[in-house]
């Protein structure tokens, strides 16, 4: 049916002239349109606008500040800032040293790598990073994931050299991934790890990490490589005859001390440094206790000798031809995504507290470069851990200089103090890890998810259960799969609703949300709440026809004026593809067969452009049947309804003429 059936009746033309006309946007050249689309997709923050109308020298200075953020804050750095950063840097170093050693053991790597990884990467981040509060270092979850994935292919005890080389290679590929995402502005990929996914994943990983520390608490020498809770508990309770009470007492004592200091610092925020110093204090006290009591002779395992000196170069250790390379690549990609998501989220959180912005893409480049450089200097995967960054924030850091101070403190430790860690008991490291992990189990966030969004809670618990009862990889895959499934569900099943008039106004709203709103006799107003694409076109066609069926049945039963007009409110339809246009043609044909008229309200520019190019507007629908607002569309339709009276719908009249 053409537009001739949709011509305005005589007498209504004057009314139409009083209404605003829906205009299609001016056509743009293809290259200009493509450039705009790419810019909006990859550069929503328009980072290069500051370079406009600047001379060459000024552009060079701005470019230097943009690509090397250290030049943004270094020129105005002063002694007052340094005093704050010095205190913060020394404070986080006291936490970084014991945590670094602990997390390296968690990854089945030599403990010294934890110190190496707290020396070089913070220096790189201080130059490239945009966060003032992020403190760089290793993290428990990435360490656990590295150990779990690499151990499936190589035994760290039987072939420690190959295992170490794979860890460096995985770190390299993690850095390449992170830097690439930042350079090509693809950081939105990380957004597929939703808040609910991260809460569940981190909670599950923290639970698994804590349970695995029972090996150190009970002084066990043989333990499962699996991370699921059943395997871990079986390994613990099948070796009760190997439990060492000396180790258990020592571990429980230090765990109680660490948790007590943490609780005290939470209650008294001014004394945050008490909890920050507690891990190093535990290492010192534990080492002294073992040294004077010779506890290592009674089943208390110690770290042993740590190599003295700065990071050795490891570029030649990277593996690019071994059959194990695929394992390194897989480990690097997965751990890189996890570390990236955590680091960016932590940086944004503290930036929000201090009311400044960080550039997510710059952060990705910074993380990537520090891991690439780290892989050449005997470091394994690093990011911005929450615990260390929180201490840095509470210590009053002003700039990334606190990372440089921390790195210098770690350098001093590597050069002169590593022999002092010989007698550090492993059980103290286990207690430090458990204490840190308990803070990652955010049960309050899970409760909040349950109250606000049950589906998000399901995603959270799926990630948690997947990690705890399966593996870290399974939990991550399950959570991401459910998140993507939910996204696809939102896209393929958009909301549609009937709109009614708010009494004594020209406002039209969803009748379910506003029960006081009233439908207009003879007119059905439908709202489409999403772009129309191939994924939802079929659903929308069926749902719109169903709305029409239900309205005609309701009108027939009530004896009201028969349905004459279908107004589609397209305010929320930002775009439409060819499948969506085909759906509109089909809807138009269905409406024609029922002797109804289709009216469009507030179609967006992109939609009007495509409907015009496809000749839907013109061949199927006249321009006069498009209105700028629902109110204008209803006014025009009501005028024609009252001018050309319609008979009430008969109860015996068939209403479904499809």
Curated annotation (Swiss-Prot):
Location of this chain's protein in the cell: Membrane
Keyword terms of this UniProt record: Membrane, Stress response, Sulfate transport, Symport, Transmembrane, Transmembrane helix, Transport
Domain STAS, chain residue ranges per copy: 513-637
Record membrane topology: Multi-pass membrane protein
Gene Ontology terms for molecular function: secondary active sulfate transmembrane transporter activity; sulfate transmembrane transporter activity; symporter activity
Chain segments annotated as transmembrane: 86-106, 109-129, 134-154, 164-184, 186-206, 246-266, 272-292, 333-353, 364-384, 399-419, 426-446, 465-485
Main subcellular location: membrane
GO CC annotations on file: chloroplast; membrane
PROSITE patterns (UniProt xref): SLC26A, STAS
Superkingdom of the source species: Eukaryota
InterPro entries: S04_transporter_CS, SLC26A/SulP_dom, SLC26A/SulP_fam, STAS_dom, STAS_dom_sf
Pfam family, one: Sulfate_transp
Function, as annotated: H(+)/sulfate cotransporter that may play a role in the regulation of sulfate assimilation.
Protein family: Belongs to the SLC26A/SulP transporter (TC 2.A.53) family.
The name this protein goes by in its record: Sulfate transporter 3.1
Source organism of this protein record: Arabidopsis thaliana
């Amino acid at each position: 049916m053409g537009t001739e059936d949709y011509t305005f009746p005589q007498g209504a033309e004057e009314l139409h002239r009083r209404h605003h006309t829906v205009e299609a946007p001016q056509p743009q050249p293809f290259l200009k349109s493509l450039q705009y689309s790419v810019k909006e997709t990859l550069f929503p923050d328009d980072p290069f606008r500051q370079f406009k109308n600047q001379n060459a020298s000024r552009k060079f200075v701005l470019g230097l500040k943009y690509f090397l953020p250290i030049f943004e804050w270094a020129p105005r750095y002063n002694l007052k800032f340094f005093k704050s950063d010095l205190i913060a840097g020394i404070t986080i170093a006291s936490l970084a040293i014991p945590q670094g050693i602990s997390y390296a053991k968690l990854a089945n790597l030599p403990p010294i790598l934890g110190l190496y990884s707290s020396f070089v990467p913070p220096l790189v981040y201080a130059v490239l990073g945009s966060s003032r509060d992020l403190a760089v270092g290793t993290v428990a979850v990435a360490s656990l994931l590295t150990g779990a994935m690499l151990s499936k292919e190589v035994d760290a005890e039987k072939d420690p050299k190959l295992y170490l080389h794979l860890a460096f290679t995985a770190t390299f590929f993690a850095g390449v991934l992170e830097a690439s995402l930042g350079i090509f502005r693809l950081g939105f990929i990380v957004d597929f790890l939703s808040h609910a996914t991260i809460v569940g994943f981190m909670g599950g990983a923290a639970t698994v990490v804590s349970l695995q520390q029972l090996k150190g608490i009970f002084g066990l020498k043989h333990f499962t490589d699996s991370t699921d809770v059943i395997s871990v508990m079986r390994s613990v309770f099948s070796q009760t005859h190997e439990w060492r009470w000396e180790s258990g007492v020592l571990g429980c004592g230090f765990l109680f001390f660490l948790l007590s200091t943490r609780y005290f610092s939470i209650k008294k925020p001014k004394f945050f440094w008490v909890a920050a110093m507690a891990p190093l204090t535990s290492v010192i006290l534990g080492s002294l206790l073992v040294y004077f009591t010779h506890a290592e002779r009674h089943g208390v395992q110690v770290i042993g000798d740590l190599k003295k000196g700065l990071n050795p170069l490891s570029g030649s250790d990277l593996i690019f031809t071994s059959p194990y390379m695929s394992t390194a690549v897989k480990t690097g990609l997965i751990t890189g995504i996890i570390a990236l998501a955590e680091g960016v989220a932590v940086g944004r959180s503290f930036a929000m507290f201090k009311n400044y912005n960080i550039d997510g893409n710059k952060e990705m480049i910074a993380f990537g470069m520090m891991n690439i450089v780290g892989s050449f200097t005997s470091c394994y995967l690093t990011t911005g851990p929450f615990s260390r960054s929180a201490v840095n924030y509470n210590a009053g850091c002003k700039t990334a200089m606190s990372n440089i101070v921390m790195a210098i403190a770690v350098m001093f430790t590597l050069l002169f103090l590593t022999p002092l860690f010989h007698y550090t008991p492993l059980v103290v490291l286990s207690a430090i890890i458990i204490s840190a992990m308990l803070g990652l189990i955010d049960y309050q966030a899970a409760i909040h998810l349950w109250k606000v969004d049950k589906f998000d809670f399901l995603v959270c618990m799926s990630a948690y259960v997947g990690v705890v009862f399966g593996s870290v990889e399974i939990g991550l895959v399950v959570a991401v799969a459910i998140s993507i499934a939910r996204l696809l569900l939102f896209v393929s099943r958009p909301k549609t609703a009937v709109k009614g008039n708010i009494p004594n106004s020209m406002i039209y709203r969803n009748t379910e949300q506003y029960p006081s709103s009233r439908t207009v006799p003879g007119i059905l107003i439908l709202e489409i709440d999403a772009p129309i694409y191939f994924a939802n076109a079929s659903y929308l066609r069926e749902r719109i026809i169903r709305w029409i069926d239900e309205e005609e049945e309701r009108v027939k039963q009530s004896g009201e004026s028969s349905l004459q007009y279908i107004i589609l409110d397209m305010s929320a339809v930002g775009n439409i593809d060819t499948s969506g246009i085909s759906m509109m043609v089909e809807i138009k044909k269905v409406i024609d067969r029922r002797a109804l008229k289709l009216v469009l309200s507030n179609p967006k520019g992109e939609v009007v452009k495509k409907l015009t190019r496809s000749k839907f507007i013109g061949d199927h629908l006249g321009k006069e049947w498009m209105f700028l607002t629902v109110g204008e569309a209803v006014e025009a339709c009501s005028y024609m309804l009252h001018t050309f009276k319609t008979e009430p719908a008969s109860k015996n009249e068939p209403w479904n003429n499809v």
